[in-house]
Amino acid sequence: MAAKERVGVVVSNKMHKTIVVAIENRSAHPRYGKIVVKTKKYKVHDEENKCNEGDRVRIRETRPLSRTKRWELSEIIGSKATL
């Protein structure tokens, strides 16, 4: 089974080797049809501390690394300066 992958934006990098990534999920309301945006935050392992706030990143699922950390950084898609 392939590991899950997500694309999101780094909202915090204040922890050592850990970043917080916010991922938006857009879906239509079942009755009214309005587009509803839901945001979920994931703690992600960043081994080299190379991400900054505002970077767009791809993350992938991994084994549990701590109580709340189950994702690792796959790649940096774009930095805040280039977005």
From Swiss-Prot:
Part of the 30S ribosomal subunit. InterPro entries: NA-bd_OB-fold, Ribosomal_uS17, Ribosomal_uS17_bact/chlr, Ribosomal_uS17_CS. GO terms for cellular component: cytosolic small ribosomal subunit. Gene3D superfamilies: Nucleic acid-binding proteins. SUPFAM superfamilies: Nucleic acid-binding proteins. This is Small ribosomal subunit protein uS17. Belongs to the universal ribosomal protein uS17 family. GO terms for biological process: translation.
